[in-house]
Amino acid sequence: MSQITPDVVAAHGLSEEEYQRVLHALGREPNLVELGIFSVMWSEHCSYKSSRIHLKKLPTSAPWVICGPGENAGVIDIGDGQAAIFKMESHNHPSYIEPYQGAATGVGGILRDVFTMGARPVANMNALRFGRPDHPKMKHLVQGVVAGIGGYGNCVGVPTVGGETNFHKAYDGNILVNAMTVGVADTDKIFYSAATGLGNPIVYVGSKTGRDGIHGATMASADFDEKSDEKRPTVQVGDPFTEKLLIEACLELMATDAIVAIQDMGAAGLTSSSVEMATNGKAGIILDMDKVPCREEGMTPYEMMLSESQERMLMVLKPGKEAMAEAIFRKWELDFAVIGEVTDTGHMVLKFQGETVCDIPLGPLAEDAPLYDRPALSLADYKAWANVAPLGTVPESTDLGADLVKLIGCPDLANRRWIFEQYDSQVGADTLQKSGGDAAVVRIHGTSKALAISTDCTPRYCYADPYEGGKQAVAETWRNICAVGARPLAITNCLNFANPQRPEIMAQIVQALNGMGDACRALDYPIVSGNVSLYNESKATGGGSAILPTPAIGGVGLMLDHEVMTTVAFKDEGDAIWLVGGEGTHLGQSLYLREIHGREDGDAPSVDLAVERRNGEQVREWIAAGRLSAVHDISDGGLLVALTEMALAGNKGCTLDIALTTAAAFGEDQSRYVVTTRAGEVLEGATRLGTVGGSQVAGVELAALREANEAFFRDWMEG
């Protein structure tokens, strides 16, 4: 009797139609190993089956792009024979179930994506979304995630230099943990994943394989329910000290000519890495499962192929290089095993105890995997479904100062010192600007150059209008990178959405990608890598089912001379304060409206991409000419919040020469900056706002603003 029953198929996350495709691909019934392999390779996490046709519309090339999407990470040319290599990944579901390990292994996985390509990691970033602070589980989740990110990054010796953290009830039952790593490599020492060379040895290196993480990729492609906590065994366990050894061993071997191809074992472990390598090399692959280093007794081929144990890599070596490579990995106290070879069959064949336990043509697993053009509402129909209330009238504030105190103290704007003090941001001694500025800035060791990095997304905008929200997420990273004086070069993304089988959710995906694509084209700012995380919704809590659409963007820019870098802090008494980009008018979907009036109403602000580019290039020009002493983009909370953040950073107040309406004070119109110059300097096209000096902003003492800004995390974590 067959062991592949309809229940077994369903438990593997395959639809009846997909199972029929498996039968057609094999010309027979699969065994359990083969079914498991199809299951993980056809999961959303590995196949992008619901998003791939839309991802293909994104701009991915530019003269400085060396490698776009499709490899482990994106690669851009930063001059002088050097490249920046970077990517962003999600670890959402594991982090909700087991926050410390989920977040830690998210960091470990994205580090491997980057050093797999030959780069030494120089910076980690993150984008975190949590539910309401008063949700009974949220404090535990925040503490665990932050400790996991800090614990792993600090031990590996890669600085965590910034990120963003937001709170909203839509994430009560499904938090988001998106991790980003940036590395630097020589352009002539970049490694790819295409397995080539008939008979070349396939080598397993790193940690041993255990039973942790089995079906992690499938779990990441499913909704949450009340039983999700039972999936704790499928959360992987990370060991950052082993990862550090793995980085050093890989980079040492990469300095030789031994490696033909290399791939980390991430989602779907040995299955995904071997399939991707063989597919990219248009080859076949045969593996001897008896040779896989195992941590536990009696592991089956099914378990070995689907395990997501951490800190493991797969390589193809040149013939005769095995002994040299093994000596390097043994020196670093890591496992090393030749477990197979490259073939020309176009099949994945697995042997175990003398028998063939798997024989699958590679085409159906990868290039010919299911591809869905799922029904999506039009933007107009989506807005009708979302039913966001019109803005209507917003009463004029009777006390701008009191509103500012409340706003600067809300969870989304509160000082994040409690978070970033747990991250080692200075390891490596090249961090020039960290959390609290517009973008993190990391010097490229031994040069005058620096990379600027920013992660951004405003999910409330994306819910109200996913097209404008997608545009805005890209534009804000561009703006933040311009604000420190760097030229924005490329982005990575982490597309977090709910169930794509719902037309309204599919509309969010399609429209956000359309907006992102338009912004990238207008700003000459291509997408070079990314990740899609779907089914981010939970039936397990009362906090609403689907998350807000959250297309998190990670931007990277280049500064040729880091001496010109600007920061947000007010510098000298008497400096002139200027507004670039016009007065605020837009209160729809603003943080002010939500925090002061308890409303999430109105349209998202629109982004005029031509204005965005013009203003950003103008600010960069002024920075390069040495005319600006401080720069800050205007985003959440509008002008008064931006001024307050500059005042708190520089410990100097400001006096304003203009009367502020509520919309001018707190409106979130896009493409705007606050900048300061020396007294007497005139900025053409900018509006003079006032002067740096004193101890107040909007009539409120800096001490009161600082206390309000620092109270939330301090009181929450001590309470």
Swiss-Prot record:
GO biological process, one term: 'de novo' IMP biosynthetic process
EC number: 6.3.5.3
Active-site positions on this chain: H45, H91
Pathway(s) of this molecule: Purine metabolism; IMP biosynthesis via de novo pathway; 5-amino-1-(5-phospho-D-ribosyl)imidazole from N(2)-formyl-N(1)-(5-phospho-D-ribosyl)glycinamide: step 1/2
Keyword Ligase: yes
Main EC class the enzyme belongs to: ligase
Stated role: Part of the phosphoribosylformylglycinamidine synthase complex involved in the purines biosynthetic pathway. Catalyzes the ATP-dependent conversion of formylglycinamide ribonucleotide (FGAR) and glutamine to yield formylglycinamidine ribonucleotide (FGAM) and glutamate. The FGAM synthase complex is composed of three subunits. PurQ produces an ammonia molecule by converting glutamine to glutamate. PurL transfers the ammonia molecule to FGAR to form FGAM in an ATP-dependent manner.
Subunit composition and interactions: Monomer. Part of the FGAM synthase complex composed of 1 PurL, 1 PurQ and 2 PurS subunits.
UniProt protein name: Phosphoribosylformylglycinamidine synthase subunit PurL
